[in-house]
């Protein structure tokens, strides 16, 4: 028997019985029966057996399944020790979905796909040995964090660590295009190369001259951004990771770009096929000035990137539109057109209703809270990566005359449910920071030199979180309540503190900091001021109870850290980012990211299998009232939770808004009828802006027929 000869199995049927209540009760025990049946019928008979871990490793090396170099850093005795430690933890998957996802997507299999070569303990073992790079204490600490599901590396890292025939450890990238053919050509090549390795790519088009702009003095010669969008879409479609999955990309455009209306129109259902983009995602960067003009119901001017760069000597993206707006309007040398700000606001809302796009990056908000030197101009495919970039200059031979910096995303996630049970919260986070540091140190995207240059200078990582709704519900706390907001604030403050501590430790050990550290708010100490003078201790009795036994830094602790950072610096330019979570949240048996669940019993359509049902983690009679669907919540409560986390996160958080096509009037005081309107979305975007939210990801609309609009999650960037 092999995985190719399974025959009739019972575990899918058992799992599907969860969705059939018996006498008003959800038969959750059927999911546990499905897990047992899955191991009995699928895993155990089809796992290749070995006498010992050393025998297994010898086989995996001989058959070219594992890299030899990382294993050579450890003695056989230590490998036996850490393997035994992992076995002693008695790890068990808590749901059928968790076990199925791990063995289907992550476990190493024989070349013919017939047999499993790894268990969860084995995958954790190889991750720990790989990321610890010969440090036995760190390897044991990492194994401890991962087997207890306190830390989860992002999918590309967890999947590929230690494998001989592996993909990259990262799968999320940001590149920018400047206003010349050499940059466009090089960027398309970069998109092809990144898509080939399974990457999701964010691309800024804001610097490109608009349709009708002059080229070499010839008026009306420029084609604008839409044809370039089509080139990128075709590139992602063509370069599809050995035919396994479609490439994925998002293009960003500033709302003051003259092509903004035609840019948005490419996603409309009734768009002409010549301009319609079907698979490319859209995002917009929104300066503060747009919100001001829309609020006042005034005209807004759109400015030609070509004339802006001629006048100011920098690409359009690097100009502060809010600061320079009046100056640009008054300058006769700046080509401009005029539209009504509220008309554009309505167009954005219409498209979000129809497709879930565009993503929204509040670019001035992102830059105001950016503590490092430079300018954030865009984001990634999931809108949580916000890092400074610099433009490149490329000659006719496609060589770099000036090497700019672009971005790769080195991601991992804390599991809130389990990290809150850690015997040492701080040590756990410091260990995770070390694991992510390995990823940034060993990520070399040589096919795109600007990304490699950015990574080498910044050493950026993105530690995030998942399982917030699970944690709150299991502690009988309503998502979005004052208690939930206060908990979120303290939790992310702690992530901020401990990643700073460890980044400072690494900088001291290596005598190295990120590029331009001395120009940052960390170096002059101003970043720490609010923590030194403010009160970030738990206030309510309930939150004090939740954090009982967990160290909460005082103002003096922050002051001490400030002095250490001023002396020795930080290794990482960026440390925190909250991505959406895909498969890894199922393996961890918690709710995805920090947003609410959408269903108590989630229905997933798996390729070649059919429906699998996943009960919310910790679902029980007493927790059911606290597992309220996101579609039945006031989205302002979700925004409030994200705002509490945002204060402490140096990058962004992937914030999805969930709305029904028929909105209950009682949810929103401005509603006079149930139908969702463009005004609803405009009000919520403005609420998010006023709460200092940096980015909004999808708008997911649940329709009367049970379909979701805007729910086509990208595989390349959910971690």
Model-derived regions, located:
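Extended catalytic cores of very large enzyme megasubunits
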Residues: 1-719
């Amino acid at each position: 028997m092999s995985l190719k000869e399974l025959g009739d199995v019972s575990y899918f049927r058992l799992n599907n019985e969860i969705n059939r209540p018996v006498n008003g009760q959800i038969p959750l025990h059927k999911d546990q029966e499905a897990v047992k049946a899955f191991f009995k019928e699928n895993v155990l008979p089809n796992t290749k057996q070995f006498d010992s871990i050393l025998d297994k490793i010898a086989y995996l090396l001989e058959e070219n399944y594992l890299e030899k170099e990382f294993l050579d850093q450890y003695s056989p005795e230590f490998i036996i020790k850490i393997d035994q430690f992992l076995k002693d933890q008695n790890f068990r998957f808590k749901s059928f979905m968790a076990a199925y996802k791990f063995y289907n997507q992550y476990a190493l299999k024989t070349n013919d796909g017939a047999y499993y070569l790894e268990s969860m303990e084995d995958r954790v073992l190889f991750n720990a040995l790989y990321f610890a790079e010969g440090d036995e204490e760190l390897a044991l600490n990492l194994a401890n964090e991962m087997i207890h599901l306190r830390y989860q590396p992002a999918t590309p890292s967890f999947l590929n660590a230690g494998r001989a025939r592996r993909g990259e450890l990262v799968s999320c990238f940001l590149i920018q295009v400047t206003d010349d053919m050499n940059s466009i050509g090089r960027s398309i090549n970069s998109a092809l190369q990144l898509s080939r390795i399974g990457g999701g790519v964010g691309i800024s088009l804001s610097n490109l001259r608009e349709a009708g702009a002059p080229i070499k003095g010839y008026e009306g010669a420029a084609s604008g951004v839409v044809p370039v969008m089509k080139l990128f879409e075709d590139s992602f479609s063509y370069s599809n990771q050995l035919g396994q999955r479609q490439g994925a990309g998002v293009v960003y455009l500033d709302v003051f770009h003259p092509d903004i209306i035609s840019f948005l129109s490419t996603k409309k259902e009734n768009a002409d096929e010549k301009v319609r983009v079907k698979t490319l995602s859209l995002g917009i960067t929104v300066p503060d000035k747009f919100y001001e003009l829309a609020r006042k119901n005034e005209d807004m001017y759109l400015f030609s990137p070509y004339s802006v760069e001629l006048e100011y000597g920098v690409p359009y993206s690097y100009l502060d539109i809010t600061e320079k707006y009046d100056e640009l309007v008054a300058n006769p040398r700046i080509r401009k057109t005029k539209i009504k700000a509220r008309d554009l606001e309505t167009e954005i809302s219409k498209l979000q209703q129809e497709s879930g796009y565009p993503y929204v990056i509040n670019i001035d908000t992102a830059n105001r809270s950016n503590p490092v030197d430079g300018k954030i101009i865009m984001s990634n495919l999931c809108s949580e990566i916000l890092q400074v970039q610099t433009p490149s200059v490329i000659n006719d031979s496609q060589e770099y005359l000036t090497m700019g910096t672009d971005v790769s995303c080195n991601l991992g996630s804390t599991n809130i449910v389990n990290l809150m049970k850690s015997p040492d919260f701080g040590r756990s986070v410091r260990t995770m920071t070390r694991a992510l540091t390995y990823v940034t140190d060993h990520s070399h995207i040589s096919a795109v030199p600007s990304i490699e240059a950015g990574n080498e200078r910044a050493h950026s990582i993105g530690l995030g979180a998942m399982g917030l709704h699970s944690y709150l519900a299991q502690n009988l706390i309503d998502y979005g309540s004052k208690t939930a907001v206060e908990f979120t604030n303290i939790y992310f403050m702690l992530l901020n503190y401990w990643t700073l501590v460890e980044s400072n430790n690494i900088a001291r050990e290596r005598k190295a900091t990120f590029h331009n550290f001395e120009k940052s708010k960390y170096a002059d100490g101003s970043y720490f001021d609010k923590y030194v003078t403010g009160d970030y201790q738990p206030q309510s009795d309930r939150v004090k109870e939740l954090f009982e036994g967990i160290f909460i830094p005082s103002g003096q602790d922050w002051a001490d850290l400030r002095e250490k950072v001023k002396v020795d610096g930080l290794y990482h330019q960026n440390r925190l980012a909250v991505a959406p979570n895909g498969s890894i949240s199922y393996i961890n048996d918690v709710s995805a990211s920090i947003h609410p669940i959408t269903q108590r019993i989630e229905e997933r359509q798996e390729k070649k299998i059919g429906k699998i049902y996943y009960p919310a983690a910790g679902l029980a009679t007493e927790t059911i009232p606290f597992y309220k669907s996101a579609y039945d919540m006031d989205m302002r409560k979700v925004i409030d939770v994200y705002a509490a986390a945002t204060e402490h996160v140096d990058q962004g958080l992937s914030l999805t808004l969930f709305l029904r096509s028929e909105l209950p009037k009682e949810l929103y005081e401005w509603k006079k009828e149930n139908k969702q309107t463009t005004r609803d979305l405009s009000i919520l975007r403005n609420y998010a802006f006023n709460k200092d939210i940096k980015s909004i990801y999808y708008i997911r609309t649940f329709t009367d027929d049970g379909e979701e609009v805007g729910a086509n999650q990208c595989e390349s960037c959910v971690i």
